[in-house]
């Protein structure tokens, strides 16, 4: 199992607007061979204690910070579950704090974790933590490593003790689209999205391409709410899509909870995002695109325990991964999913894992009829990082 190591970045203005910042990357696809044997550690132990009782000086203390609640059925829950996957790992303890805003408060939390809890590897997971908060603390604590979820690290500009990680979750969205393509009766899908940034557009497009690989006439109606967490607008958007005849809905917002619950109340199918939301829609939940941060956090811990750091270049500063690397996964299929849908999805999943499936193939057009993919683009193609179009079959406009 290998993880992609990128060596560039960019400047972003909106929270979690990750992909736009990778436009200037000069070497996509350089492969780190450090990340091998990525089998998550999931043995149960007490959450904030090491698995055994080794000498305190040998314990690796890892700190995790979330902008929202740990149980939001979304972005923050996915990171919390990744942290929980470290339980049982020898000589590792974890400390975490939820509900920390993207203000100087996160600096105080990081400083407390470093000074009082002796944390030496910090994982502040929200986009807005990076600049200026992580950068300021990193300069003050050069021996502490700061790992940020995003693509913001720039070589030569940012401190050596800062790194970034992210993943190709659009691969899981493509598979979810295949399931949706099998299950829709109307041929109309819906997508509730926060903002038309490249990462969001890539999820919309990959979901649509997966569905249209089953039925080329399928359409995806998209509604942008304008921000990452607007529950009222998310409910309104979902209801509006149902009123327009869609019978499967998915989303890209911080917490899919409202979208999934609204879909269940309206009696349509839903597909999740970030984490598993099946408990919110026992009848209509088909599957979902999930993060598997346990893989990432476990391997970071193993590398650090082996003496590798960002500072000695033992750990790449910018890391990416998808199905093959264990960064993303698909939620378990819901009871409504047909055997044919499962078979098609599993086949595509296997091809993503072995690298034989190309989502963005030569000749793809946007929804205005313009060819936007002149040649096959693999997942690391720099052209996909600046995506500013909606694929053919998507009904909607980028404001």
Residue ranges and their predicted role:
Residues 1-38:
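N-terminal secretory signal peptides
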Residues 49-399:
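A residue-level marker of the well-folded mature domains of exported/periplasmic proteins
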Residues 8-12, 34-62:
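C-terminal segment of N-terminal export signals and the immediately downstream linker at the start
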């Amino acid at each position: 199992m290998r993880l992609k190591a990128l060596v560039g970045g960019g400047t972003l203005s909106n929270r979690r607007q990750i992909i736009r910042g990778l436009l200037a990357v000069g070497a996509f696809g350089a492969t780190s061979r450090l990340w091998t044997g990525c089998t998550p550690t999931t043995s149960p132990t007490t959450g904030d204690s090491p698995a055994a009782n080794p000498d305190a000086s040998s314990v690796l203390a890892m700190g995790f910070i979330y902008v929202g609640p740990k149980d939001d059925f979304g972005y923050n829950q996915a990171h919390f579950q990744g942290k929980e996957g470290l339980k049982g790992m020898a000589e590792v303890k974890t400390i975490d704090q939820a509900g920390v805003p993207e203000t100087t408060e996160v600096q105080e939390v990081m400083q407390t974790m470093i000074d009082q809890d002796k944390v030496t590897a910090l994982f502040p997971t929200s986009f807005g933590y990076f600049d200026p908060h992580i950068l300021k603390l990193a300069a003050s604590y050069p021996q502490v490593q700061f790992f940020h979820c995003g693509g913001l690290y720039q070589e030569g500009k940012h401190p050596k003790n800062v790194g970034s990680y992210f993943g190709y979750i659009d691969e899981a969205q493509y598979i979810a689209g295949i399931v949706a393509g099998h299950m829709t009766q109307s041929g109309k899908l819906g997508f509730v999205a926060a903002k038309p940034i490249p990462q969001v557009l890539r999820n919309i497009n990959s979901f649509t391409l997966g569905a249209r690989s089953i039925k080329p006439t399928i359409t995806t109606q998209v509604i942008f709410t304008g921000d990452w967490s607007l529950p009222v607008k998310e409910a309104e958007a979902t209801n509006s899509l149902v009123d327009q005849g869609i019978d499967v809905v998915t989303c890209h917002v911080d917490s899919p909870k409202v979208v999934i619950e609204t879909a269940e109340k309206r009696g349509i199918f839903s597909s999740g995002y970030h984490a598993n939301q099946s408990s919110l829609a026992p009848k209509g939940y088909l599957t979902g695109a999930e993060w598997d941060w346990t893989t990432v956090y476990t391997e970071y811990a193993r590398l650090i325990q082996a003496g590798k750091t960002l500072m000695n270049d033992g750990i790449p500063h910018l890391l990416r991964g998808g199905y093959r690397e264990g960064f993303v996964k698909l939620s378990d299929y819901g009871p409504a999913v047909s055997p044919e849908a499962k078979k098609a999805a599993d086949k595509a999943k296997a091809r993503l894992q072995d690298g034989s499936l190309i989502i963005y193939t030569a000749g793809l057009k946007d929804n205005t009829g313009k060819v936007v993919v002149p040649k096959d683009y693999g997942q690391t193609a720099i052209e996909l990082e600046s995506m500013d179009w909606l694929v053919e079959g998507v009904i909607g406009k980028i404001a």
